[in-house]
């Protein structure tokens, strides 16, 4: 209705207010523009109110977000503690698995526990025998590795290997070799007992074996009990884990409910803001102004306006009802929010109360179970160590038994070896006898041959000439060594001379630099002297010029002469002073130049001498290098000769051996005598060496005795020092014991203070809990006050809007009266000026005066056709109709 009536109203207003195109703006139009500015002010206040509401909602959301952040931090801390306990359990379990693996490795490392020792417990394809497989399956199914399956690492997927497989492998490594070992030991024991004779030792062995079997059965029973307890612990841990999962699910559900409640609250806030905006728009709508025209408003239009007003009132009632419902919902949500804040505060206090956490049943149960599991783990570890010790003892006994068996087989092997060695020795003796007979025959043949004395003399001459040649060669080698040493010394001298030459060159360069500096100083001084001379000449010229001037009076001339004399005296003094300084500088420079020239001359002489020495040393070096080359060539020739002589000597030695063999074969008596003489000489030399060594040892022992005496003296001094230090250390120990007792007393006091502090901490925690509850109550009260304040502000704003709307209505009523009066005036203007009843319908084009058609027709019927307003004559063609 309102949307269809708006264009009609605009059309009526445009048709009624446009009598002419260039007419000025009427006052009604100016008044019609005023309410738009008021609407803008109302819109601005509405926007300001909305912004305020949105800021308050933002603050509330921030508070909720902070509360949720605190809750999330508490839950995160709880999760961290849970993760720490879980990591501790995981580490203990991994340590247990590692210990099991190490035990299994120790078991598999025994010599008789290998899978290929001849037992039938392991099949060819590497799979275990049915007994071990059933044992492992029963262990895994009964829960020996369930706790490892409960760890977080087992839920990582197929990529991460589950821990229960490692524990199963470790248990398999322990149980399978132990079963193989038990079976092998049983077989060995049965075989040994069957082979042993029936006596006391065999009975003792049987009794010990039965005792070992009973102890092994006890260990197996203990392991089964350990398995049952482990299964119970795994079930308890699984139950605890299920309960923690349920708690996490409950926590997740509560978080989702909180998020949904927050989202619903946001939606309701958004809807409420939209409804408030609609209400503000309905309250701030403009009152439709009556249209202007030359006739009264029709009844159907009035009815349409009434219907529109009724519809607006109905919508206003609906909106007010909806607003009341939304306010009730907001109150309910506010109460729910306060309840949630109370719950969050209580949860925070519960989570942050360490005393209640420590005193909680779950924490105590977990702590007791951990302690029990730790004690059981230690107990079972000791049992496992005992089992390992028993196993080692059993392996040692088995080794001793095998050693005895091997010792029983040793005599048989020794007898067979002795028989074979006797047969080999008989064969060797027979071969030696045959060789002896052959040598006897060869000696007889050699004794019959002539020329034996000549061979002996040649051999003796050759032997006597060899040491002379060796002495000559050694003397030549010593000469060559001396020459090489001289060459090294000459090289060292050349290096030293080159260093001296480089040093002299550096000194020469420094002296040349100094002389250059002195020359530059001299040139500077000479330039200064020339400048001073020029200034002196100029001053003299100025003095002559002033003397020649005679234009002034006599007194002025006298004063000027005096002044000139004084200035001349001053300049003379300055010049004398400068000349004296310059003379001193010139003298010093000349002396320095003379000294530098002397040094330069000495340096040049030294450079020349060093150059001559360098040339001579280079020449000597060249000659020595030539000599060295020649000596090296000679050494190479001597080496070749020595090698040739050595080869000849080796050949001669071979011939000598052949000749000696021939001589020995020909003449046994001579060789025997010669050997006896050689032996006598060797014994004499050995005796001389022994006497010399004894003397030397005696001297060394005497020197050692002196050293030992010195060491004894030093050790006595050290003993005195150590005794003094021990006394000091005893005193320090006594002082430390006193200080330790003091520290222990302080420690007891500190423990007491710590207990007091713990008690005070408990009290403080209780106070903190109570203060937190008080803070939560204060927050709730603050929230209530904020809510009531918001309600009051909303009511105040509604009342202010009502007051503003009433003021606007009052203003609009006054404006309506004015408009009605103006409408009457405009209607009077639009009515005909002759009859004052009908509307103006025609215009006289000569004077542009408006009248109704009937009055103009009456004037046209008369003879005098004149305008009633200006009495201007017009014709029928001058009358034109208009449409207003």
From Swiss-Prot:
A GO term, aspect molecular function: protein homodimerization activity
Main localization category: nucleus
Biased composition (Low complexity): 108-121
RING-type zinc finger span: 832-871
Keyword vocabulary terms for this entry: Chromatin regulator, Coiled coil, Metal-binding, Nucleus, Transferase, Ubl conjugation pathway, Zinc, Zinc-finger
Listed Pfam families: zf-C3HC4_2
GO cellular component, one term: nucleus
Stretches assigned to coiled coil: 49-86, 216-541, 580-663, 696-762, 789-827
GO biological process terms held by the UniProt record: cell division; chromatin organization; defense response to fungus; innate immune response; leaf morphogenesis; positive regulation of cell division; protein monoubiquitination; regulation of G2/M transition of mitotic cell cycle
SMART domains xref list: RING (SM00184)
PROSITE patterns: ZF_RING_1, ZF_RING_2
UniProt catalytic activity: S-ubiquitinyl-[E2 ubiquitin-conjugating enzyme]-L-cysteine + [acceptor protein]-L-lysine = [E2 ubiquitin-conjugating enzyme]-L-cysteine + N(6)-ubiquitinyl-[acceptor protein]-L-lysine
Compartments (UniProt record): Nucleus
Stored Gene3D superfamilies: Zinc/RING finger domain, C3HC4 (zinc finger)
EC number per UniProt: 2.3.2.27
Pathway(s) served: Protein modification; protein ubiquitination
InterPro entries according to UniProt: E3_ubiquit_lig_Bre1, Znf_RING, Znf_RING/FYVE/PHD, Znf_RING_CS
Class of the enzyme per the UniProt entry, highest EC level: transferase
UniProt-annotated stretches for the region Disordered: 1-37, 107-127
UniProt key word Cell wall biogenesis/degradation: no
UniProt KW Nucleus keyword: yes
Domain remark in the UniProt entry: The RING-type zinc finger domain mediates binding to an E2 ubiquitin-conjugating enzyme.
Function, in words: E3 ubiquitin-protein ligase that monoubiquitinates H2B to form H2BK143ub1. H2BK143ub1 gives a specific tag for epigenetic transcriptional activation and is also prerequisite for H3K4me and maybe H3K79me. It thereby plays a central role in histone code and gene regulation. Forms a ubiquitin ligase complex in cooperation with the E2 enzyme UBC2/RAD6.
PANTHER family: E3 UBIQUITIN-PROTEIN LIGASE BRE1, RING FINGER PROTEIN-RELATED
Family stated for the protein in its record: Belongs to the BRE1 family.
Protein name: E3 ubiquitin-protein ligase BRE1-like 1
Native source organism of the sequence: Oryza sativa subsp. indica
């Amino acid at each position: 209705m309102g949307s269809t009536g708006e264009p009609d109203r605009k059309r009526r207003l445009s048709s009624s207010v446009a009598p002419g195109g260039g007419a000025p703006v009427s006052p009604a139009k100016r008044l019609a523009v005023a309410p738009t500015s008021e609407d803008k002010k109302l819109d601005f206040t509405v926007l300001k109110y909305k912004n305020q509401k949105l800021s308050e909602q933002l603050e509330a959301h921030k508070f909720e977000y902070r509360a949720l952040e605190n809750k999330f931090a508490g839950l995160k801390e709880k999760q961290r503690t849970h993760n720490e306990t879980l990591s501790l359990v995981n580490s203990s379990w991994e340590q247990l698995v590692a210990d099991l693996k190490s035990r299994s490795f120790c078991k598999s490392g025994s010599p008789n526990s290998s899978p290929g020792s001849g037992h039938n417990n392991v099949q060819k394809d590497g799979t275990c025998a049915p007994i071990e497989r059933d044992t492992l399956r029963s262990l895994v199914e009964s829960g020996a590795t369930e706790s490892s399956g409960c760890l977080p690492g087992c839920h990582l997927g197929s990529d991460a290997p589950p821990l229960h497989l490692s524990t199963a492998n470790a248990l398999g490594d322990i149980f399978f070799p132990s079963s193989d070992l038990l079976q092998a030991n049983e077989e060995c024991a049965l075989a040994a007992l069957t082979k042993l004779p029936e006596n006391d030792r065999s009975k003792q062995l049987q009794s010990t074996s039965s005792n070992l079997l009973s102890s092994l059965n006890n260990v197996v029973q203990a392991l089964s009990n350990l398995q049952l307890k482990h299964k119970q612990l795994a079930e308890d841990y699984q139950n605890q884990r299920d309960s923690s999962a349920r708690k996490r699910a409950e926590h997740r559900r509560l978080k989702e409910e909180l998020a949904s409640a927050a989202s619903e609250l946001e939606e309701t806030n958004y809807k409420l803001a939209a409804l408030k905006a609609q209400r503000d728009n309905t309250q701030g709508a403009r009152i439709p102004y009556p249209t202007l025209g030359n006739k009264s408003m029709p009844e159907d239009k009035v009815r349409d306006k009434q219907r529109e007003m009724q519809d607006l009132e109905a919508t206003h009632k609906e909106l007010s009802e909806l607003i009341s419902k939304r306010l009730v919902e907001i109150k309910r949500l506010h109460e729910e929010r306060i309840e949630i804040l109370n719950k969050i505060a209580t949860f925070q206090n519960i989570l942050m109360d360490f005393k209640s956490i420590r005193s909680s049943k779950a924490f105590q149960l977990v702590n007791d179970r951990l302690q029990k599991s730790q004690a059981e783990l230690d107990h079972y570890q000791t049992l496992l160590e005992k089992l390992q010790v028993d196993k080692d003892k059993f392996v040692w006994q088995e080794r001793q038994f095998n050693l005895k068996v091997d010792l029983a087989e040793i005599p048989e092997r020794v007898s067979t070896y002795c028989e074979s060695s006797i047969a080999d020795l008989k064969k060797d003796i027979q071969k030696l006898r045959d060789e002896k007979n052959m040598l006897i025959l060869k000696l007889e043949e050699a004794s019959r041959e002539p020329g034996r004395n000549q061979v002996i003399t040649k051999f003796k001459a050759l032997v006597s000439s060899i040491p002379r040649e060796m002495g000559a060669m050694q003397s030549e080698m010593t000469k060559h060594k001396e020459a090489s040493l001289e060459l090294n010394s000459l090289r060292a001298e050349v290096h030293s001379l080159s260093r001296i030459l480089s040093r002299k060159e550096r000194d020469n360069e420094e002296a040349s630099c100094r002389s250059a500096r002195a020359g530059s100083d001299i040139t500077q001084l000479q330039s200064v002297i020339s400048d001073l001379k020029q200034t002196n000449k100029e001053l003299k010229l100025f003095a002559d010029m002033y003397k020649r001037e005679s234009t002034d009076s006599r007194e002025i001339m006298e004063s000027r002469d005096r002044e000139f004399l004084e200035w001349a005296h001053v300049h003379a003094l300055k010049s004398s002073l400068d000349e004296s300084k310059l003379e001193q500088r010139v003298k010093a420079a000349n002396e320095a130049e003379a000294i530098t020239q002397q040094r330069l001359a000495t340096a040049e002489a030294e450079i020349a001498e060093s150059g001559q020495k360098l040339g001579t040393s280079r020449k000597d070096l060249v000659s020595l290098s030539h000599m060295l080359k020649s000596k090296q060539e000679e050494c190479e020739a001597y080496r070749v000769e020595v090698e040739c002589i050595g080869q000849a000597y080796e050949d001669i030695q071979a011939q000598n051996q052949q000749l000696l063999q021939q001589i020995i074969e020909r003449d046994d008596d001579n060789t025997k005598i010669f050997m006896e003489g050689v032996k006598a000489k060797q014994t004499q030399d050995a005796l001389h060496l022994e006497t010399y060594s004894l003397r030397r040892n005696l001297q060394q022992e005497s020197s050692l005795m002196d050293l030992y005496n010195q060491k004894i003296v030093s050790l006595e001094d050290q003993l005195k020092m150590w005794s003094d230090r021990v006394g000091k250390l005893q005193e320090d120990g006594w002082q430390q014991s006193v200080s330790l007792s003091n520290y222990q007393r302080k420690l007891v006091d500190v423990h007491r203070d710590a207990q007091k502090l713990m008690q005070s901490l408990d009290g403080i925690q209780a106070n903190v809990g109570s203060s937190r509850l008080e803070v939560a109550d204060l927050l709730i009260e603050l929230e209530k006050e904020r809510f009531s304040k918001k309600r009051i502000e909303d009511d105040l704003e509604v009342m202010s809007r009502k007051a503003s709307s009433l003021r606007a209505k009052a203003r609009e009523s006054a404006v309506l009266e004015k408009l009605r009066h103006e409408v009457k005036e405009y209607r009077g203007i639009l009515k005909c000026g002759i009859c004052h009843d009908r509307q103006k319908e025609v215009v006289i084009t000569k004077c542009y005066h408006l009248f109704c058609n009937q009055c103009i027709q009456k004037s046209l019927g008369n003879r005098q056709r004149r305008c009633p307003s200006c009495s201007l004559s017009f014709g029928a063609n001058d009358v034109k109709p208009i449409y207003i």
